[in-house]
């Protein structure tokens, strides 16, 4: 929940290295994390941290689409939101911020003004690169057919997407007749844009098992003793010791710390929570709890992030085949998407690094080769992928997939450009053929594989 400090614009020399003359940029896919937010639950009120934060000015400016009675006319309804909670006598009271604020008060896990600012700035940075510097996208848009935008059903993800779009194409860059953009969402049970333990029983089993293993490894260590020395006195009576599986969990403690770091002095914890060694320990354990499964288990990769990566690669191959599977059918436009952006959470971005080792109803399009495994393709089908490359960048840093390092699996002279064929081959291994069916399979099987199944190959 703390802000990435972005680098400045790329120089011309950097652009030449990132985008070699012998290659032509064809498709950009951006996976963004939602912006800064308030904590998802109220913690450490005994340490002076107020449960309700005054950083959500959008609460004064809410807008809803309303339909007039006996008419098909729609009118935007502007309204102001205030939050209500329990008072000391269990009666209703208006939630207040640290200084008694009743407006601008955030709900739990809500995108804050800071989060809106940074995601809008992300859109501006993307415009600078893909519009101004590379000329890949148009300066002025008359429609949004070339865009594929998707967000999870969590409001902060959708709002972050909207802010990023606004930063990339502010009002002056949209023609007066430009229709509103289409943003794709799914129901929670169908969502694969984040690791969906709520919609996938088997993945819930796996994630709990890896979390428990982390607890067994770390709860009785010197590192955990140090955390208890620092902040144990603020733990609740019902769970006095800091632990991976305490209440609040260690990951929940990290959530609150990071949220406070991203915002103002009115919502800060005591200085012990920001001890550098303590923060490093919390982050190390949190990464193990949440992401080690991707490194060790192909089933974990498949159910946790495989559906999303299958979609990502399908759109890459669809862009090569020009068969509509690059997002054209979903958006209902006439032109194939050139730029795709999805808004989710930290668990998606970090999960993607880990797996590499590091609307309007339309008729379904042709299956093509996008969802076929590489091993099932004919020579003619496989040849369609020749000459296309995939590169991953994470927070402006180029990432090289281990399985793409061998000769013939990358662009000569640059291992970061993986051949589309090899990238698809790696992703095929953990792309579920039937995600919902697989989520109900192996429920009696062990959570851990017999031997570790390394990621990135």
Model-predicted segments: where are they?
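Signature for phosphate-centric chemistry
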Residues: 1-148, 152-340, 346-457
């Amino acid at each position: 929940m703390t802000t990435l400090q972005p680098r400045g614009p790329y120089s011309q020399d950097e652009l030449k290295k990132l985008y070699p003359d012998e290659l032509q940029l064809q498709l950009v896919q951006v996976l963004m994390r939602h912006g800064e937010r308030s904590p998802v639950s109220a913690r450490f009120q005994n340490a002076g941290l107020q449960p309700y934060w005054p950083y959500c000015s959008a609460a004064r400016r809410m807008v809803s689409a309303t339909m007039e009675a006996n008419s098909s006319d729609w009118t935007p309804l502007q309204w102001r939101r205030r939050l209500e909670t329990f008072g000391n006598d269990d009666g209703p009271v208006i939630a207040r911020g640290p200084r008694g604020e009743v407006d601008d008060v955030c709900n739990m896990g809500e995108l804050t003004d800071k989060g809106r600012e940074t995601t809008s700035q992300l859109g501006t940075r993307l415009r600078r690169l893909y519009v101004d510097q590379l000329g890949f996208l148009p300066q002025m848009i008359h429609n949004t057919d070339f865009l594929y935008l998707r967000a999870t059903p969590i409001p902060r993800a959708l709002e972050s997407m909207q802010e990023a779009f606004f930063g990339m194409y502010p009002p002056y860059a949209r023609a007066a007749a430009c229709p509103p953009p289409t943003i794709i969402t799914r129901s929670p049970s169908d969502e694969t844009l984040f690791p969906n333990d709520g919609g996938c029983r088997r993945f819930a089993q796996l994630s709990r098992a890896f979390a428990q293993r982390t607890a067994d490894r770390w709860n009785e260590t010197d590192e955990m003793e140090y955390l208890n020395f620092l902040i144990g006195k603020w733990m609740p009576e019902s769970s006095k010791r800091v632990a991976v599986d305490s209440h609040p969990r260690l990951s929940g403690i990290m959530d609150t710390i990071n949220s406070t770091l991203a915002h103002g002095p009115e919502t800060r914890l005591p200085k012990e929570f920001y001890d550098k060694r303590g923060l490093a320990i919390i982050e190390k354990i949190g990464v193990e709890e949440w992401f080690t499964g991707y490194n060790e288990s192909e089933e974990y990769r498949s159910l946790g992030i495989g559906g999303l990566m299958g979609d990502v690669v399908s759109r890459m191959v669809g862009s090569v085949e020009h068969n509509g599977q690059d997002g054209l059918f979903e958006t209902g436009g006439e032109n194939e998407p050139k730029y795709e952006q999805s808004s989710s959470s930290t668990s998606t971005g970090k999960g993607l690094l880990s797996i590499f080792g590091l609307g309007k109803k339309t008729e379904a399009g042709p299956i093509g080769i996008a969802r076929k495994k590489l091993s099932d393709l004919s020579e003619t089908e496989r040849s369609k992928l020749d000459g296309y490359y995939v590169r991953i960048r994470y927070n402006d840093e180029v990432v090289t997939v281990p399985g793409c390092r061998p000769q013939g699996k990358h662009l000569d002279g640059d291992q970061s450009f993986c051949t589309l064929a090899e990238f698809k081959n790696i992703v095929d291994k953990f792309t579920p053929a039937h995600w919902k069916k697989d989520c109900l399979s192996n429920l009696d099987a062990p959570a851990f594989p017999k031997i570790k199944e390394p990621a990135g190959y």
